[in-house]
Amino acid sequence: MFVCSLCKVQCVCFEKLASSIENQSDTSSSLRRIQRFISLYSLDKDLIARLIFALLPNDPPYSIAIDRTNWKFGESNINILVLAIVYQGVSFPILFKLMPKRGNSHTSERIEIMERYIKLFGRETLEYLVADREFVGEEWMQYLNFNRIEYHIRIRDNFWIRNPKNDKQFKV
């Protein structure tokens, strides 16, 4: 009920969530229940991912995007690796990994989030992966190729590409 209210209200304001819950209780009672729930319960991230996946209006396979966001909150660095399903130009974050450091993700972190997606939803639900230019590297590309994951990755203008058919290199 709580997660459905989050989707309905599209915010995390407890008062708005409480007023959106359709039941016989008073809004203040719903608010206290939400506060108790948040303070006592640890949400299962995989369960939330499955719920979001089930609520998507279209059937798989899906395009997925991987991205990273980094900002400072006071003295704390917040760095999150996100895997999202892209549907009609909108990205729905489905999996994330908090990274205890600043800067780009490592290949192992990317593989971990991809493996989690495949474990939860299956490889067949993935049409292709979209990523920005920070998501490159030989080991990462080998992982994607080995697992037959089609990808569209922006690359830097100073990159050299090797054509596997004739082994010739050319600058992008």
Question: What label would you give each PLM region?
Answer:
Residues 1-16, 76, 110-111, 116, ...:
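Solvent-exposed, charged interface segments at domain starts and junctions
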Residues 27-29, 54, 59-121:
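RNase H-like nuclease fold core
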Residues 15-17, 37-51, 70-80, 159, ...:
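Short, charge-rich amphipathic segments
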Residues 17, 63-70, 83, 91, ...:
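Short, conserved catalytic/metal-binding motifs centered on acidic residues
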Residues 6, 23, 37-41, 71-72, ...:
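Short secondary-structure transition/capping motifs
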Residues 96-172:
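An internal, acidic/charged active-site-proximal segment
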Residues 1-60:
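Electropositive nucleic-acid engagement tracts
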